[in-house]
Amino acid sequence: MAKKIIGYIKLQIPAGKANPSPPVGPALGQRGLNIMEFCKAFNAATQGMEPGLPIPVVITAFADKSFTFVMKTPPASILLKKAAGLQKGSSNPLTNKVGKLTRAQLEEIAKTKDPDLTAADLDAAVRTIAGSARSMGLDVEGVV
């Protein structure tokens, strides 16, 4: 028989830097989960990733105080800013362009994001990422 699920917790935690302080501690503490056990497991799972890269994670809490977690891919906006070498996007994306990305860079980001995108193929995924880039004030080359 499957364990009874008491809730889901969605967080964005920097890779390799999970610790009991907010937001992790209070979110897990409310459900009575072992905070340090999660922190150790998350940090071990993100060990090979770039330190500090925000990783979305969905934690499933069970009635017996156990948990499982699923890591998603980093947000597209973070990957786009990193590829363009920016600190933040444009405050007015229609008139104030802050950077430029090529199709090759967008394809690389689309391949990274592929498990979380619902796109039918790589070209559709690239167009999705290109739309995110445009909304951040980035010029996109080679994508219609």
UniProtKB/Swiss-Prot annotation:
A GO BP annotation: translation
InterPro entries: Ribosomal_uL11, Ribosomal_uL11_bac-typ, Ribosomal_uL11_C, Ribosomal_uL11_C_sf, Ribosomal_uL11_CS, Ribosomal_uL11_N, Ribosomal_uL11_N_sf
Keyword rRNA-binding appears in the UniProt entry: yes
Any single Pfam family the record assigns to this protein: Ribosomal_L11_N
UniProt-listed SMART domains: RL11
UniProt keyword Heme, yes or no: no
GO cellular component: cytosolic large ribosomal subunit
Role: Forms part of the ribosomal stalk which helps the ribosome interact with GTP-bound translation factors.
Protein family: Belongs to the universal ribosomal protein uL11 family.
Quaternary structure note: Part of the ribosomal stalk of the 50S ribosomal subunit. Interacts with L10 and the large rRNA to form the base of the stalk. L10 forms an elongated spine to which L12 dimers bind in a sequential fashion forming a multimeric L10(L12)X complex.
Annotated NCBIfam families: L11_bact
The protein's name in its UniProt record: Large ribosomal subunit protein uL11
